[in-house]
Amino acid sequence: FPDFGRGEDETLNLLAPYVLGRATRLDSPISFAHMDPPTPWITWAMSLWNARLNQNLLHSASAPFAVEAEKKVIDWLTPFYGMDGGHMCSGSTIANITALWAAREVRGVKKVVASRSAHFSIAKAASLLGLSYEQIPTDVRGRLNLNEIEDMSDACLVLTAGTTDTGAIDPLVLVGQAKWTHVDAAWAGPLRLSLTHAYLLDGITGADSIAVSAHKWLFQPKDSSLIMFRDTELANSGISFGGSYLAAPNVGLQ
């Protein structure tokens, strides 16, 4: 380490050519169809506010408006998916882990079933939670093959709405046929807000939990996602902790 720091201005000038010159430019024409979109300017301002105020959402006393704003966002979005609540997460990997955690705690699932095209975060979640993991072959369109499904009476079935490789949407007619059904809608979830394409996710409202990335088709900075539950009170009962300095329960992996 040097004996003396360079100071903020000199440090920014030193880093600018690297940070700005060597970043992937998502607003470039050659980034067309990239799942991580360019962000609108208003999110830059909000990110500055967030860094400046450094709010802690563990309790309303430490982040009065931020806690209220999160609830308003959840209350606005959940009806599109048939869910009754949830919370924000730092990315859909965390959202998926939270969903499978709730499935284990409140329904006692023993294994996770997903297609071979499911996001690797599902395998991560199963491993972290001590659940067995079964991958189902896909059909010619990259969707979970209906004909390969077996007994799911003790399973959490994970259906993908928008696979990473091809954007395929698993058959949502399978919703409700397992002990717990989670839909990883990180990519295609915002289709529910579309007047013309919401039908592509018909059936999703019967799921027990849904993950949606805000930093994809909702054009928010990374990492930002939502985990939503059909029965939030039930789900939260298995993934909430408190005590000590926390006056309110801490839900999930926040």
What kind of region is each of these model predictions?
Residues 67-75, 85-108, 121-125:
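Conserved beta-loop-alpha segment that forms the PLP phosphate-binding cup at the N-terminus of a helix
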Residues 98-101, 123-128, 168-171, 191-197, ...:
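Short acidic, glycine/serine/threonine-rich loops at helix termini
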